[in-house]
Every structure is written in structure tokens, then in C-alpha cells.
């Protein structure tokens, strides 16, 4: 179940937001950052969210690697990307699964409030056997290829 961001919440795993809610958080709060926790192959070949119109950049930190294996330095790399304690973070993956783990781990490390973006960048697989049902791209939010 999705929960609406609440500014009175203490830092921590704050739950889920849909792509539109994440976009609105990024628009309205200059402190909110996006961490895309997909793999480099996904960023390169599928595309990425484009926050340039907001004067922001996406932090790209892989949760796991293309050939398998978790990124043991994930939290350290999130911090190296400039994410600070107390700063709202929206985590994005392909379909909203890896980003849950990323948000929870960030919370355990003292970062956040941390949100998982439901549906992710590409969303669920539809009847067409393509990821064309929901997600950041399908909802028409800014993105770019390559």
C-alpha cells in the first residue's frame, strides 16, 4: 500500500510512493534526491530519469551487478554521491523491487527518510509482454535514453 510522504516523519524507511509522488517530491523540495539503483547496463540501454529540468542530477549507485552479486559498498557509494543524513531520498529500480531493499538498507545506515518508488522506471510486464503498464516512463515523467 502506498503512503503519502509526511514531512513530520523522522528519518527512516518511509515506505512507498508512486512515480508521480516521487516527481512531486523532487519538484517541491530542493533537498530531495533520487538514487537510481539499477545496473549500469540498464542505465545505458534502457534509459534514466531526467531531472535536469529541476536543476538536479540522479545519483547512480547499483544495488547489484549485471552479472550478479550485491554491491557490498552500496551505502558508502550513496554517501559518496553526496546524499546526507536527514535528506529525503527516493530510490528507483526497474520495477520497484530492488529499490525497497535499497531504501531499507539506507535507513539502517542512518540515511533518509528513504522512499521506494513503486512501479520503478519500467514498471510491470503487460499483456504485450513488454514493460508498458506503469512505471516512470509510461507515466510520461521526464527521462532520456543512453
Q: What is the predicted function of each stretch?
A:
Residues 1-33, 40-88, 99-146:
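Rhodanese-like catalytic fold shared by cysteine-dependent sulfurtransferases
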Residues 91-92:
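Short, surface-exposed ligand- or partner-binding patches at beta-edge/loop junctions that are enriched
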Residues 96:
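Conserved G/P- and acidic residue-centered "switch" motifs that form tight phosphate/ATP-binding loops
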